[in-house]
Amino acid sequence: MEQRVFDSHLHIIDPAHPLVENRGYLPEPFTVADYRRRVSGLGIAGGAVVSGSFQGFDQGYLIEALRALGPGFVGVTQLPADADDARILDLDRAGVRAVRFNVARGGSADLDDLERLARRIHELAGWHAEFYIDARTIDETLSRRIAALPAASIDHLGMHEDGLPALLRLVERGVKVKATGFGRVHLDPAAAVRAIVDVDPTALMVGTDLPSTRAGRPFRDDDLRVIEEAVPAKHMADVFWGNAARFYLGSDTSGRGRAE
């Protein structure tokens, strides 16, 4: 792609580090070298390495992956509710920038710990909160809780067409959304992208979701083209780079990694 891309959602699976079986599932290895080979030519110059349910609260793999990927890449991790400040600050120095609540698969802190943990981490290190959640399960009470956080995002377009109204209400309240995981969603990605951009073009971020663990199909290069065709030209640079770079790096010019 000619467009510079911030991959807001990728996984690195390093068998040298602990993996936790999740609902009978263990993923195949997907190393930094595998990732670089797969995205070669896509214009990716930065991204967010996201911890999956099968990695639990381990950050060893994440720190190594960020070191190997270099500038422009940050981490999204899962933490127990009782994680101490020193651990959080160590992870921040290593490049971690968000805490993830994996409601769909588990392996993260519970939603009961949502406000306390997310707010404490934001006040301490400036991190935002990310949610892997089926938007159909977001009632008005949970919507208010998520929207009241200092900064938050929703993975994979909220997963389901029936959850789109709830997702758009969050977008109206300032929550970001990742256009990722097209092989695992039950909706028309192009229609969802257009709806989000219509509400707030600064809310949308793109990503590969590689290596697409447990998805109905893996990421395809054409998934990015679907987004290109759905987004007005005037918003293209922000959707593919600027929105995510500001969210994760604090600036749309901070990504120093070279395009792959």
Description of each model-found segment:
Residues 111-206, 214:
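Catalytic pocket-lining loop regions of alpha/beta-barrel enzymes
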Residues 9, 39, 62, 99, ...:
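Conserved, mostly hydrophobic/aromatic
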Residues 36, 63-64, 193-194, 225:
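Active-site phosphate/pyrophosphate- and oxyanion-stabilizing loops and adjacent acidic/basic residues
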Residues 29-37, 82-91, 163, 189:
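Short, acidic/polar
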Residues 1-61:
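An N-terminally biased module of ancient metal coordination in phosphate/nucleic-acid-related enzymes
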Residues 56-136, 173-184:
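Active-site gating/metal-coordination segments in enzymes
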Residues 3-4, 28-46, 202, 217-260:
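Mid-to-C-terminal alpha-helical segments outside catalytic/metal-binding sites
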Residues 10, 52, 157, 208-210:
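Active-site metal-binding loops of divalent metal-dependent hydrolases
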